[in-house]
Amino acid sequence: MSHGRDIGYELQSSLLVDAASGLPVAPLAQTLTDSAGCHSTLKDDTSAPQTHMDALTTDITRLEALDIGKTLVHIIDREGDSIAYMWELSVQGLRWLIRGKEGHRVQYKGETQKLGEVADGLEFTVRAEVDYKGRKAGLAISEAPVIITRVARPKRSDKETGRRIKAQPGHSLTVRLVVAQLSDNEGRVLGRWTLLTNVEDKLCGEERAQWYYWRWSIESFFKLIKGAGHNVEAWLQHSAVLRRLLIVSMACVLAWRLQRAEGEENARARQWICRLSGRQQKRSRRESTPSLLAGLAILLNTLKLLSEYPRRTDPAGSKSPVPVRRCVDTYVRGWDAFITFL
């Protein structure tokens, strides 16, 4: 929803991803905003709707309070390029990586320049090879320190007047500019990300750019969510909305993780799960996440059905399982083996 007259709902998801491999771990939070207010898995009651960045900042603070035992780096797209929110997160000691808007101005070497102009003047070195839209691309990295001094223009309304809050003088904020550039074998530029971060300098720019590459690939996870039962208005229920959101999200995480897992055993598991879905796949392409999700749904429902089949004894009085039960045991052993692949 982009304005008050829109019809629908908004879903904001926080997904925990392994920084080393880029594989999903679990959905940490779901925040659903509809006509009744804001529902979140991070709190029990319903709250008033907030702007996108206010809601995100609130969720980030609550996620940090979970104390999961690891240092969190919050990766945010271009909407997060706001000095007000960068400063708010930084003063709390929270770490973030945000894609900057190239038209915004920063101070670099004592001069005020657009972020894109600073990126144009940097020298790049290819550090790694990554997948980009189904083909290989070189990932070149360059970085530099910049200072953000522009005024803050938060998208908030004054509670008394209802008008948008006026621009506020901002505090200067020194951050690291990391520019990631993708190019093909002939040197043609395929894409560029200008990233701003307050993560300490002891980490190399390649590692920080890789994090955003993981975030960019996560888009496929959210596309899977949109096509996997998150049509809330069709559920015809009100009591278990958030529980269903988390179940669907976890199923999407499992399918997404399996689709990206390497190794011969994982490849066989993907082929088998895809065959269960009944969907056709191109020979040269890896099995798609929608087909894997459909196959997993069939597998789990089948296992559930077979596991509930009553145990019976044969006429001779033996308590050994009948063939159907042996089939169940075979399926369960196969499922346990499949889980170990992940």
Language-model regions, residue ranges each:
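Single, function-defining residue in the core of a domain
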Residues: 3-10, 17-342
